[in-house]
């Protein structure tokens, strides 16, 4: 689309009014008072989301030949207990004992310190207008706190605050509690003291079936269903690795304090990719296609220094220097960047931030977030994690089901390794019903532990085997642990997983913010400059007036566009044509087709482009062909101007 000049500062109040007026999204159950963290999408919001998902599928699933699945939202307790979510999928919350109000501890510390720094800038006479606009709930809390008025802080305190904010995601509950105590962080509304932070599990618990005996949860992510179907997916892919599965679906998180509109909600749409790869070879065969792409990186080391300086470099160099671990992780980071650019995100407001060690998910060994800046600050929208072999390993162990790849070796290999062999005649009678569990525990030991136990068996004549918290003594006459040679023709391994995970609701929101601007000549005329490929409606059809002669032509034109897959809307209301254009600019409709009296004579129509408001005129077939080409991204409006020439009109 045409480049636009967003001279006016972003006005969130005005933007939110447009979202409400045009019903992009709205709080759920609003006539009953609504529930925080739950939202409904209206017609333009639903269409925008559908187009976003469609572009995502084409960009990832089709382009990368991924295997798409659709798995159950209800997940049994055992699955999420095994995955670690029951014990570790939590945030830190603190409670005001006087009012009962609940705060998410890291967000509270962040908001209060940011507000104090803002007050310090005001006291020093510095301009703080470059700070992201604050949410209404932030403002309400901040304005009641005495410490954050225009009060000058000493330089050391400012430095401490900035250091803390640069690595706010790296603090655990005890550390957050210490920060709250050290810097006297209280309930911003009442100034009341808060309880020590404690963990709150974010999953929605439910009962499966009428008896209530089977506990389950609404899934917190779509990944687990993909892992549990790994063997079927591997078979579907003819046993070949690497390959990727993909899924788009709803996930649920019982957020402590939902806020910021669509950015922190309790029900949301995710799109996740699980790329299964050989742990000994994490090279991606298409990395050369993207290695030249510059990405804006915020590595862990920079954050640990209390800084947020962006390091911009080609992803190929980032991998060579060890900043990004491997080419598969780097490839997906580059592909994520291309996707965000394709849908219309302002790439000058995107960065890839590496997770700190303390904020890393329990399953990840490395993770980079694609964060996008909007009026709420930097928002995590896409995570790109190396989950190693964690998920497949824990599910395999829990179910005693091998979730592995078996690969024929080009040549047989002679290997030496320690093996456990029990004396069947003595072992069974000695341990009775525990015999199988004790034997399996010894066999499952890693090589290093088998070496250690073998030496202990020789030195002491016995070893201790722990099974489910119970210690069993195994004497040397019951078991042998020795190094043996054998020939292998098959290599068996558990693949590692690289996981790009997309919060589509967050992406949708920041896209709408980035697309929004107002006409310089009239700040009340809002425009949403969506790329044509993602716009909810591609074309507006406007008859010049309500003259009955226009109706047949308008209906035929609309039908032609629908047959070509171009969504369109007819606006034959009594409003003047400029007003009709303006309200569809608010919907992000990129093109307008005008039917007038000249159309009735020679079947020519006018094509208007949303951002520039420039128009061209040509025959119906030629204009439709140009429109389709622009919607498909094969040409631009500049190409249409070159072909048809600009048509001057006074209709706006």
Curated annotation (Swiss-Prot):
It comes from the Eukaryota. Glycine binds at residues 221, 272, 499-501. Residues 119-145 are annotated as: Disordered. GO terms for molecular function: ATP binding; ATP:ATP adenylyltransferase activity; glycine-tRNA ligase activity; protein dimerization activity. It is found in: Cytoplasm. The keyword Aminoacyl-tRNA synthetase applies. GO terms for cellular component: cytoplasm; cytosol; mitochondrial matrix; mitochondrion. Its EC number is 6.1.1.14, 2.7.7.-. Catalyzes the ATP-dependent ligation of glycine to the 3'-end of its cognate tRNA, via the formation of an aminoacyl-adenylate intermediate (Gly-AMP). Also produces diadenosine tetraphosphate (Ap4A), a universal pleiotropic signaling molecule needed for cell regulation pathways, by direct condensation of 2 ATPs. Thereby, may play a special role in Ap4A homeostasis. This is Putative glycine--tRNA ligase.
């Amino acid at each position: 689309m045409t480049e636009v000049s967003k001279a006016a500062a972003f006005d969130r109040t005005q933007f939110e009014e447009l979202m409400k007026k045009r019903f992009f999204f709205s709080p759920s159950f609003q006539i009953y008072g609504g529930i925080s963290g739950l939202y409904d999408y209206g017609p333009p919001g639903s269409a925008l989301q559908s187009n976003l998902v469609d572009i995502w599928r084409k960009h990832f699933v089709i382009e990368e030949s991924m295997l798409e699945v659709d798995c159950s939202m209800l997940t049994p307790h055992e699955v999420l207990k095994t995955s670690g979510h029951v014990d570790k999928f939590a945030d830190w919350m603190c409670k005001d004992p006087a009012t009962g109000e609940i705060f998410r501890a890291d967000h509270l510390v962040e908001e209060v310190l940011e507000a104090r720094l803002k007050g310090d800038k005001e006291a020093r006479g510095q301009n703080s207008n470059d700070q992201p606009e604050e949410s209404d709930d932030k403002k309400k809390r901040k304005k009641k706190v005495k410490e954050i008025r225009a009060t000058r802080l000493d330089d050391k305190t400012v430095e401490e605050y900035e250091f803390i904010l640069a690595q706010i995601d790296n603090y655990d509950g005890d550390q957050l509690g210490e920060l709250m105590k050290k810097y006297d962080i209280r309930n911003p509304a009442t100034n009341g003291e808060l309880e020590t932070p404690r963990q709150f599990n974010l999953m929605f618990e439910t009962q499966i079936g009428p008896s209530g005996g089977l506990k389950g949860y609404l899934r917190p992510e779509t990944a687990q269903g993909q892992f549990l179907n790994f063997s079927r997916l591997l078979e579907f892919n003819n046993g070949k690795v690497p390959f990727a599965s993909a899924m788009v679906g709803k996930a649920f998180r019982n957020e402590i304090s939902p806020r910021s509109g669509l950015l922190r909600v309790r029900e949301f749409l995710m799109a996740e990719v699980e790329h299964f790869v050989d742990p000994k070879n994490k090279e991606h065969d298409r990395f050369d296609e993207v290695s030249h792409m510059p990405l804006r990186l915020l590595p862990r080391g920079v954050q640990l220094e209390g800084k947020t300086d962006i390091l911009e470099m080609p992803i190929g160099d980032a991998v060579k220097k060890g900043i990004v671990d491997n080419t598969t992780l780097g490839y997906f980071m580059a592909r994520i960047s291309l996707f965000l650019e394709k849908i219309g995100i302002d790439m000058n407001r995107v960065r890839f931030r590496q997770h700190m060690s303390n904020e890393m998910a329990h399953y990840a060994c490395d993770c980079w977030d694609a964060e996008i800046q909007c009026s709420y600050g930097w928002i995590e929208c896409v995570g790109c994690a190396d989950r190693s072999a964690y998920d497949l390993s824990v599910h395999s162990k829990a179910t005693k089901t091998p979730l592995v790849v078996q690969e024929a070796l080009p040549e047989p290999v002679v290997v030496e390794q320690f093996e456990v062999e029990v004396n069947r005649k003595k072992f069974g009678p000695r341990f009775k019903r525990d015999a199988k569990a004790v034997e399996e525990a010894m066999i499952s030991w890693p090589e290093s532990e088998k070496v250690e136990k073998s030496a202990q068996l020789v030195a002491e004549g016995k070893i201790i085997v722990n099974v489910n918290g119970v210690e069993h003594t195994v004497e040397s006459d019951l078991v042998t642990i020795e190094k043996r040679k054998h020939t292998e023709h098959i290599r068996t391994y558990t693949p590692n997983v690289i996981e790009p995970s997309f919060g589509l609701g967050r992406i949708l929101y920041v896209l709408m913010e980035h697309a929004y601007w107002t006409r310089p000549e009239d700040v009340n005329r809002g425009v949403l400059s969506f790329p044509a490929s993602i716009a909810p409606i591609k074309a507006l059809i406007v008859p010049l007036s309500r003259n009955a002669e226009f109706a047949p032509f308008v209906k035929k034109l609309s039908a032609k566009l629908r047959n070509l897959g171009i969504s369109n809307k007819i606006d034959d209301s009594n409003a003047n044509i400029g007003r009709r254009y303006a309200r569809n600019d608010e919907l992000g409709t990129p093109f307008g087709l005008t039917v007038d009296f000249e159309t009735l004579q020679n079947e020519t129509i006018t094509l208007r482009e949303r951002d520039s408001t420039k128009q061209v005129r040509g025959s119906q077939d030629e204009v439709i062909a140009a429109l389709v080409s622009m919607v498909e991204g094969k040409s631009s409006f500049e190409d249409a101007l070159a072909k048809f020439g600009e048509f001057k009109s006074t209709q706006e």
